[in-house]
């Protein structure tokens, strides 16, 4: 990769060794656990909240400090992420900035300790509430497509529908200046906040609400990613794209395809089909 991977502003030792919810130590190499689910999905959409508008930041740098974990543990974690990223590249993802972001984010910190040993395989994994964290390839693929825009890949402001555990938002934070993410399930919204808080990522804004309504108070967006599949993309989301912006979403019921929608003008959008995929269904409203 030509782009040097950024580092989160966190101590990986404090995060990797934090006591998990059940009191067991989280170790991505030695934790026995559940098997991965075959779904390549993320999360349902969320409710439009009426919280005050947060002023936009002006290209605030969001670099990540070098880890202070014991060198052996750090090298193991780095090696696993490098191997995962190399596998994603072999699957066809070529955007060096996306690959660097995937390599920088410790995926095992976003899931239960019992599944940490499977964190870097190319599969989705359960995160609770009948939802999953998407497989690494699909995360990288969707972000790569969104970045391949007419603005040389620059993303000033992006919207994620379906925060889930917060992993994809963390990856997005390294390729976009501002990231807004909506989650409709309250428990997952709180989980994402808990996962991201120690990482001190300044350019992520998490919202609890109905993602099918988007986030008009923060629009327009250069890119929008949906982590749940509807029969069609909600019109409200299309209208929140900036002209030249890109929306990437799974569309369909039993048979789903990844679809790219580009906004050409105020009243015109064009779409193209990318590949088959499988996501959880897009649902309206919220779950408390």
Curated annotation (Swiss-Prot):
Pfam families reported in the protein's UniProt record: PCMT
Protein name: Protein-L-isoaspartate O-methyltransferase
Family: Belongs to the methyltransferase superfamily. L-isoaspartyl/D-aspartyl protein methyltransferase family.
Family annotation (SUPFAM superfamilies): S-adenosyl-L-methionine-dependent methyltransferases
Known role: Catalyzes the methyl esterification of L-isoaspartyl residues in peptides and proteins that result from spontaneous decomposition of normal L-aspartyl and L-asparaginyl residues. It plays a role in the repair and/or degradation of damaged proteins.
Cross-referenced CDD domains: AdoMet_MTases
Record-level GO BP terms: methylation; protein modification process; protein repair
Enzyme Commission number(s) from the entry: 2.1.1.77
Main location: cytoplasm
GO molecular function terms attached to this record: protein-L-isoaspartate (D-aspartate) O-methyltransferase activity
InterPro entries listed in its UniProt record: PCMT, SAM-dependent_MTases_sf
Biased composition range(s): Polar residues: 36-45
Superkingdom of this protein's organism: Bacteria
Catalytic residues identified in the record: 134
Reaction it catalyzes: [protein]-L-isoaspartate + S-adenosyl-L-methionine = [protein]-L-isoaspartate alpha-methyl ester + S-adenosyl-L-homocysteine
Keywords attached to this entry: Cytoplasm, Methyltransferase, S-adenosyl-L-methionine, Transferase
Gene name for this UniProt entry: pcm
């Amino acid at each position: 990769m030509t782009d040097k991977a950024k580092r989160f502003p966190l101590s990986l030792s404090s995060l990797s060794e934090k006591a998990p919810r059940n009191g067991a130590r989280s170790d991505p190499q030695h934790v026995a656990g559940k098997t991965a689910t075959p779904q390549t999905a993320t999360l349902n959409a969320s409710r439009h909240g009426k919280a005050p508008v947060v002023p936009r930041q002006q290209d605030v740098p969001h670099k990540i400090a070098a880890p202070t974990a014991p060198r052996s543990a750090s090298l193991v974690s780095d090696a696993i992420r490098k191997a995962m990223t190399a596998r994603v590249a072999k699957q066809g993802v070529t955007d060096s900035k996306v690959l660097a972001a995937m390599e920088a984010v410790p995926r095992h910190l976003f899931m239960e300790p019992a599944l940490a040993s499977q964190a870097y395989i190319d599969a989705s994994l359960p995160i609770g509430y009948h939802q999953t964290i998407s497989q690494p390839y699909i995360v990288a693929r969707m972000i790569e497509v969104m970045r391949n825009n007419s603005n040389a890949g620059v993303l000033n402001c992006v919207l994620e529908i379906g925060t889930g555990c917060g992993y994809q938002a963390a990856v997005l934070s390294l390729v976009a200046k501002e990231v807004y993410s909506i989650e409709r399930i309250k428990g997952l919204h709180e989980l994402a906040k808990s996962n991201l808080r120690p990482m001190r990522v300044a350019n992520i804004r998490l919202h609890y609400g109905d993602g099918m309504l988007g986030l008009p108070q923060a629009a327009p967006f250069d890119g929008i990613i949906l982590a749940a599949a509807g029969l069609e993309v909600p019109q409200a989301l299309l209208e929140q794209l900036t002209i030249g912006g890109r929306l990437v979403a799974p569309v369909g019921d039993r048979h789903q395809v990844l679809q790219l929608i580009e906004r050409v003008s105020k009243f015109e959008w064009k779409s193209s089909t990318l590949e088959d995929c499988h996501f959880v269904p897009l649902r309206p409203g919220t779950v408390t």
